[in-house]
């Protein structure tokens, strides 16, 4: 489908982005996560990728997107850890497109330096998602939004449940810090 035939929902995406990044007193629960649901084939993924992500990024958020249907041979946990790892590697790579987009953060020409072990992210004895997100938010001092498309793929397996617990721990670790 060409992007010309899409029905963009820019206003809705902008309102949602604003509510997520700057929640009012009645919106504080959005800091715990938001689920977008609906019947199949109505444009949820298109909305996320074409409207919401650009709206979040235009407001300075660092967005990590992962589609759990992207590679059915990989577990949801592996896909999420890979997406986080790849984003962090891009931020550590001098001259990367992501680093350039975030140039207003004064991360330096050499890239972002994180004190975590990326090659073992999510593995036993390696860095956790909580450690990765804490370090990322502390270094960038910007909103980080993790979008997991087809999150229902995590349900029904022990590994999927463990991933959801790890994501909750990461959310709690970041949200517990003052000013985040």
Model-derived segments and spans:
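Walker A/P-loop-proximal flanking segment of P-loop NTPase domains
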Residues: 1-40, 46-55
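Short, structured helix-loop boundary elements
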Residues: 10-13, 77, 126, 164
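Alpha-helix termini
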Residues: 21-29, 56-58, 134-140, 171-178
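P-loop NTPase nucleotide-binding core
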Residues: 32-160
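Sensor-1/coupling segment of RecA-like P-loop NTPase cores
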Residues: 153-154, 158-180
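Generic solvent-exposed, charged/amphipathic alpha-helical segments
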Residues: 17, 81-85, 168
